[in-house]
């Protein structure tokens, strides 16, 4: 049977499944809250417990932060990953085909470029670039981040990011996150607007009836593959199911059961071990240093306080007397007791320089763990004689350190974003292609060459290209070696395919396909040039023949002969008497 919002069986099953998912995450929560306290105090939503509930969302949270290096390092990591991997200022992905020869066809190349341009426009218009920094922050701090990509009538797509602590995840047999359960809060008014008053529990109905519109209600939401899918045209029988219900309601009743043609769930981890659902992060590695840093900073402040405002000793005669420590003030004592004034209890002079150096070492360890030295490499290098080549090599070498996480982010986050966005664009454009609707489609119809062809995504961001820099260096070395050999034997250049070298280098550099001429057009251009060269050669030969004939005297030339045709091409006309 197909589950409907009315039968309640689906709600019971998901309440039971949610309990198992909560049990899986329990062991991570204490660790996450420590990471939150030391690296990202304003992140996290622990709304169902006593920690940062709805009434305390605006209160101060950075009470454990004395030295801000961990927070600044997290901000640098998030900004560096955003600008290095998904910068809105430059293309960071490219669509191509599995067959390189197919991608070189002019019509295919132009269509792929048009779709890329449309997708970049959609991403810029949506809130993607406002959400991604938070995603990078979460995987850097907690090792796990999650959001959904939803269709939008105004912006084509929009993204909603979920804070750590508010959701629970499960993964498929392929170790990919495909199930989300989360808890959040809506006011009574928002619930009625979103789901309708008839779908609400009796408790919410009574609140709405009594005008308690701004009362907060805990709501549960789940997104998962539809394992009981039956194709009968109903929304809850789509490949992916989305379900809402009230967390505190005693009724086994869904607020709504909706569906998606493709999964909107986007779960990403920094790195994982074995069958773990939740990931590990660089902040987990730096947590000990962050705790030590705050303790050292506290002890340094205490030491400075003891030097500037030390504990004092005083004679007993001053016990009940007025004593002032204010600048310029006077404390009266007898002349016989003038040597028995206030004095520090001990002459202690802490080595503040050594303490400061130790703090700097802890700060440096945190920055290195969070790749701050990588993202701020040029800022930290104060040498004036560094060469451009050295800058490039050092930049590429350091960026290689992010290779594993870049590959994982591309695989778990960016690739699904591009796939789902492309599916949405195709679905919205198809009625215009088929003439069912009038107007311009979001993307043009694909050329015939791409029928039944699955497209491939290539990432060309700064971080992705750093992984390909080894190929560029190898190509440069090969051509440099061939050039040196060609001075002794020019025939060695026949071993190199210069056209293919241009194409591959352009791909590695992420050059726009409009700059590189497709192979079929290059062949046409070369054929036209060859024909022009043949015609020019024939004209030269004809003119030379005409000159020879003129010198020889009146010789009649048959126009059907090769000489006659050459003279005709050259414009010499018939020659003879």
Question: Can you name each region flagged by the protein language model?
Answer:
Residues 1-214:
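Extended, helix-rich architectural segments
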Residues 1-30, 37-39, 44, 309-577:
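C-terminal anchoring/interaction modules
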Residues 4-7, 11-13, 19, 150-327:
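Structured, contiguous alpha/beta core segments that scaffold functional sites
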Residues 32, 77-82, 131-139, 219, ...:
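Generic hydrophobic, helix-prone segments enriched in Leu/Val/Ile
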Residues 37, 69-86, 287-296, 480, ...:
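Short, hydrophobic/amphipathic alpha-helical patches that form generic packing surfaces
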Residues 63, 92-109, 117-124, 267-290, ...:
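Charged, low-complexity surface segments at secondary-structure and domain boundaries
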Residues 74, 104-151, 278-312, 347-379, ...:
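Long, contiguous amphipathic alpha-helices that act as assembly "spine/axial" helices in icosahedral shell
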Residues 127, 132, 145-146, 163-173, ...:
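Solvent-exposed, flexible loop/coil residues
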